[in-house]
């Protein structure tokens, strides 16, 4: 796999080149994890295009997993709901993993409907709507984070130079991403992308402020404070995918394994959680092992700004 630079780069070009170079010799051994989860935030009318209606969004994660593993020509139990914004990213991902000969592992952390393909079942119920300020039980957050850290360390011990690719499908997840980023003290309103052609920034921000306020985490300027407890923020307004993925990053990248977070705003929230949870002294080494990769559509989306979001994240940590 050529170590070519991405089309759009946010961050240091030399660091990106070094990360790509480190992965180039071992990309055929990449571990691919697709993390499925659910949040009742997806039932808010108008919040997402990952399914045309709140009811259809219940099986979007299952449909994405089945499309990724089986492909568009196969008979699948859960047909992908109509998507007003266009083609599912799962179709693109299927083409990529098929071409590269990679074998994704699907992990269900609490999707509303389980996928009808082989998968690892770690799920409970979907998270509550983030506007409640009680999205997840704190014990569940701690359990998923610890599980991710142990799993990440095991993967690093098995293949320290083999890349780990973490992908997700969480309908409503860009809103939980905005909520977590905001709760951690980042000004990201209007910067977060979504599945809709025109992200509903006002609705997202209203839900985020309601959730953080209900949890007692809303500070001046509509954000969390600089010393916000990341686990408290995650329990208040996050989703299960974020907890496990942050643990995987800390465990795998912390042990020196390259990690690619495949996504946009949702993976920015995972990365922010990982940085907030690790010590300042360990952040530079962690950052050398982690990259976020997304599609050109997300990177260049006119109605959001992932590059600016990542710049603010980098300035914060």
What is each residue range found by the language model?
Residues 1-167, 171-317:
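N-terminal loops that bind phosphate or other acidic moieties
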């Amino acid at each position: 796999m050529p170590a070519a630079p991405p089309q759009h780069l946010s961050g240091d070009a030399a660091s990106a080149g070094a990360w790509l170079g480190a992965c180039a010799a071992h990309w055929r051994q990449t571990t691919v994890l697709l993390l499925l989860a659910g949040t009742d935030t997806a039932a808010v009318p108008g919040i997402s295009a990952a399914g045309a209606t709140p009811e259809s969004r219940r099986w979007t994660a299952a449909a994405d997993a089945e499309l990724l593993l089986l492909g568009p020509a196969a008979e699948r139990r859960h047909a992908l709901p109509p998507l007003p914004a266009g083609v599912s990213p799962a179709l693109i991902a299927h083409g990529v993993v098929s071409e590269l000969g990679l074998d994704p592992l699907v992990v269900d952390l609490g999707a509303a409907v389980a996928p009808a393909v082989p998968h690892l079942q770690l799920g409970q119920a979907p998270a509550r709507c983030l506007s409640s300020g009680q999205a997840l039980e704190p014990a569940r957050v701690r359990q998923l984070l610890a599980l991710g850290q142990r799993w990440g360390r095991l993967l690093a011990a098995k293949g320290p130079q083999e890349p780990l690719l973490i992908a997700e499908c969480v309908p409503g997840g860009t809103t939980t991403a905005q909520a977590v980023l905001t709760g951690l003290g980042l000004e990201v309103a209007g910067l977060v992308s979504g599945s809709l052609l025109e992200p509903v920034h006002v609705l997202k921000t209203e839900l985020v402020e309601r959730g953080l306020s209900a949890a007692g985490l809303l500070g001046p300027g509509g954000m969390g404070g600089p010393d916000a407890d990341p686990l408290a923020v995650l329990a208040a307004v996050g989703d299960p995918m974020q907890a496990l993925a942050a643990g995987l990053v800390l465990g795998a990248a912390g042990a020196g394994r390259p990690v690619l977070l495949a996504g946009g705003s949702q993976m920015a929230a995972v990365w922010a959680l990982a940085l907030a949870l690790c010590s300042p002294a360990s952040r530079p080494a962690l950052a050398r092992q982690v990259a976020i990769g997304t599609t050109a559509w997300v990177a260049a989306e006119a109605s959001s700004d992932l590059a600016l979001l990542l710049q603010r994240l980098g300035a914060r940590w």
